[in-house]
Amino acid sequence: MNLKEKTRALFAEIFGYPATHTIQAPGRVNLIGEHTDYNDGFVLPCAIDYQTVISCAPRDDRTVRVIAADYDNQADEFSLDAPIVTHDSQQWSNYVRGVVKHLQQRNNAFGGVDMVISGNVPQGAGLSSSASLEVAVGTVFQQLYHLPLDGAQIALNGQEAENQFVGCNCGIMDQLISALGKKDHALLIDCRTLGAKAVSMPKGVAVVIINSNFKRTLVGSEYNTRREQCETGARFFQQPALRDVSLEAFNAVASELDPVVAKRVRHVLSENARTVEAASALEKGDLQRMGQLMAESHASMRDDFEITVPQIDTLVDIVKATIGDQGGVRMTGGGFGGCVVALIPEDLVPAVQQAVAQQYEAKTGIKETFYVCKSSQGAGQC
């Protein structure tokens, strides 16, 4: 039973009438452009074929009822006429409540909804299960009540909910790609203007995501430190963000900067340039150049931004040794564990899977999880 059938069946069973709509919003993986989003830079993610699915129907009152199928059918219920506050014990509820609360501030021309939610985006793997949920919930209200909101506004609404209601700092990339993703394409996103350009993916290439299953511990504190270091760098150049600093300007005065800050700045500037070039390489189907750019990106994250861990570097080395120059691999996500992403010709996927299975656990003592994905469509009815 797929997620649509599962949520529709559960909806009828619990609420006693059929759902009128089923909405999906995908998770994502970022192909290149790491820690560039909060520096007003460029990112190149694609939506993946793992998603949050919500079967739903409008109500004729002001009540919102929600069932979380993946949490033993836990329920939440709240009124649109009372202040929406955080739920004490159900963290998943706060993503739903936060999205609805922030939607009210944007456009409150909507009434109650019944919904059943289920998803298969792996949680804690850095594949944006939370953004997928936020965008799915926003799309439910937009579709059921014909709200005049576009994908970018639904994405911004989800980001606000996560930052201000759930209390977790995040850039805009995750929500934007979930809302605007295009099948068989990646999206080059300008995080300053939120402009997005669809970039066609080469045919016969798989998007492979491998979770190192190394438990991330430093990610929160170190993420904030990196942001501060980048802001320090921007201030040094008297610019609003590192997006506005050229590599030439940086190289001319790099020795005057604090050495650690200089390394952080060099990563962001070089990564921005790589991301823009990667979009063009991908569009031309030049997997060899894309692979070189991904390798440079990984080295920069390891040596200049210092956010990789030995387990991730091991995983990258195993994949690279197997594919040579026929594709690319790098760490993806915030760092300190998480996943690597690889672009691999489909016929090489079994060899990569076998090499990783034989070597990774033997070298690290941890078993990986292997996902073969396709670039998929953004949020909408399914």
Swiss-Prot record:
Residues at which ATP binds: 124-130
MF GO annotations: ATP binding; galactokinase activity; magnesium ion binding
Subcellular location: Cytoplasm
The EC number(s) this enzyme carries: 2.7.1.6
Pfam (any one): GHMP_kinases_C
Example of a GO biological process term: galactose metabolic process
Site residues by UniProt (Transition state stabilizer): 28
Domain of life of the source: Bacteria
Reactions catalysed: alpha-D-galactose + ATP = alpha-D-galactose 1-phosphate + ADP + H(+)
Gene3D superfamilies registered for this protein in UniProt: 3.30.230.10, GHMP kinase, C-terminal domain
Keywords: ATP-binding, Carbohydrate metabolism, Cytoplasm, Galactose metabolism, Kinase, Magnesium, Metal-binding, Nucleotide-binding, Transferase
Entry binding sites for substrate: 34-37, 223
Example of a GO cellular component annotation carried by this entry: cytosol
Binding site residues for Mg(2+): 130, 162
NCBIfam families, alphabetized: gal_kin (TIGR00131), PRK05101.1 (NF003472)
Protein name per UniProt: Galactokinase
Gene: galK
